[in-house]
Amino acid sequence: MGYKIGVVSQKGGVGKSTLARSTASTYAAAGWNVKIADLDINQSTSFSWLQRRLKSGITPVVNVECFGTLSQALRVADAYDLMIFDGAPHATKATVEIAKVSDLLVLPTGLSLDDMEPTVILANALANKHGIESGKICFALCRAGNSETELAEAREYLSETP
């Protein structure tokens, strides 16, 4: 049975696919058999990324497949050391399903309150309403420059999340 990481968010454009792809590439470079399940069939960002990498001969090759549902992705998950679920934008019922089956759930966010507030709301809903273990939910600061003050403020805000 492979390890499963879900990358989900309440809103689009916060770096879900970028984070899913960089994580997958890092593990693949270390010799893991990795697959990204691109669950946003309307945009297919991770799948398009794979096509560009293949055309350019970039390695390591990361397996990416578009799936219409999580259950379709789960059918092949055990064939891989690591399956990364690249969730669709906006939290839905599928977001809860991804959270339930993932060993680690990553919620990417920017540094602004406009990004962090909905992310915290989602984390709280997953833990309090849907019973997702809070210890497997983590935040990833994306597109976060190098301002020590901004990073410290963001970490403080996110650390106050139950």
Task: Indicate where each model-derived feature is located.
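Conserved catalytic-core segment of NTP-binding enzymes
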Residues: 82-162
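Hydrophobic positions on the alpha1 helix immediately C-terminal to the Walker A/P-loop
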Residues: 19
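P-loop/Walker-type NTP enzyme "switch/lid" segment
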Residues: 4-14, 22-96
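Short, solvent-exposed charged binding patches
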Residues: 1
